[in-house]
A protein has these predicted regions:
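Lumenal/extracellular ectodomains and adaptor appendage modules
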Residues: 19-337
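Bacterial N-terminal signal peptides that target proteins for export
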Residues: 1-7
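N-terminal signal peptide c-region/cleavage motif recognized by signal peptidases
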Residues: 13-15
Length: 337
């Protein structure tokens, strides 16, 4: 059973109406995915998460008397464009937006990137490539190349559900942008050779997508069939101690948005990696909240504070939960101006 862990964080003062416009969604990313292999066990996993980096150190054991060649993949979250694209993209590299790096037994892995574009369930990858359009459904480069296309191509893109026209006035009269609304699916893959009866170490690092909002939103009253307190309790296990710590910082006890914090959200997808033999022999998690003044809350079992900013949990014979991902809430303390 997951226990609840609550620690304190921080926020700036903004009215409720501002929160929707100052919110950045996060992209949930996980670890490596292996083609199912019942000969290989995960002897240990050491997972470290902060707003700057996710690092996973795996130790695998090939329990068979033969080498095992395994297809390994790192699936990226789907990215769907929209007229008000507000998603945290960690880097500007369209072919490695998470700054993904992996080593296998100390040697860098050369992974192959697979990218596909879908709209209304139809693969439109080759069509976009034929027009010279980047596959990323966001960014100035993509929009500029879409806008430069002949009208007949723009009409065909709209017909296929790949773009929508967005009109705006930036002070130079009305303009129309072709805005991408397709979905980009991306996965890295490579082949790994696990020697018979031997241990293998895989180290995997990337920059997380950190979402957030400019104020603390979970103290607000329920609205439009949404209860912030219940939602945060379910996702982040925000307990009474955590809530009370935030309430103590309110500048105005009658204003739930007056706590001196901003929110950061990090999602780690760990339910996709259960493709090895048996449980994880030893699992160790370290989460760093960034600053000693920040507050943090996430769901874990027997979590201990081990430093000014770090919280850790250790488990043996661990199965990642199938019914939930690791959702981390960090409240970033804002200093008075």
């Amino acid at each position: 059973m997951l226990s609840r862990l609550g620690f304190a964080l921080i926020v700036a003062v903004f009215p409720a109406s501002a929160l929707a416009n100052d919110t950045m969604a996060q992209l949930g990313v996980g670890g490596l995915t292996f083609l199912t292999n019942d000969k290989i066990e995960m002897a240990s996993e050491d997972l470290s998460i902060s707003a700057e980096q996710v690092k996973v150190v795996y130790e695998f054991k090939n329990n068979s008397d033969a080498d095992q060649r395994v297809l390994v993949a790192f699936p990226l979250p789907d990215i769907t464009g929209s007229g008000d694209f507000m998603v945290s993209v960690p880097t500007e590299d369209p072919e490695n937006i998470f700054g993904f790096e992996t080593t296998f037994n100390g040697k860098p892995v050369e992974a192959t990137l697979h990218q596909y574009v879908f709209s209304v369930g139809i693969d439109q990858t080759e069509y976009l490539k034929s027009l010279g359009i980047p596959l990323t459904p966001y960014g100035n480069d993509t929009i500029e190349k879409l806008n430069a296309l002949p009208d007949e191509d723009k009409q065909e893109l709209m017909h296929r559900g790949l773009v929508i026209p967005m009109e705006y006035d930036a002070g130079q009269g009305w303009q129309t942008d072709m805005t991408p609304v397709w979905t980009l699916k991306s996965t890295y893959s490579w082949e790994a050779n696990f020697k018979a009866g031997a241990l293998a170490e895989v180290i995997h690092t990337y920059k997380p997508s950190v979402g957030g909002t400019v104020g603390v939103s979970f103290l607000a009253e329920p609205y439009e069939d949404y209860d912030p307190a219940t939602s945060y309790k379910k996702d982040y296990c925000t307990d009474d101690a955590f809530i009370n710590a935030v309430k103590k910082t309110l500048k105005d006890k009658n204003d739930p948005y007056s706590a001196p914090f901003t929110e950061s959200w990090i999602s780690y997808i760990w339910s996709t990696g259960n493709n090895w033999s048996g449980p994880i022999g030893r699992f160790h998690l370290t989460v760093d909240k960034g600053s000693p003044e920040n507050l943090i809350s996430f769901c874990g079992t027997d979590v201990k504070k081990t430093g000014p900013t770090t919280f850790e949990m250790t488990a043996t014979d661990f199965f990642p939960p199938y019914d939930r991902e690791l959702e981390i809430l960090i409240l970033n303390r804002q200093q008075p101006e």
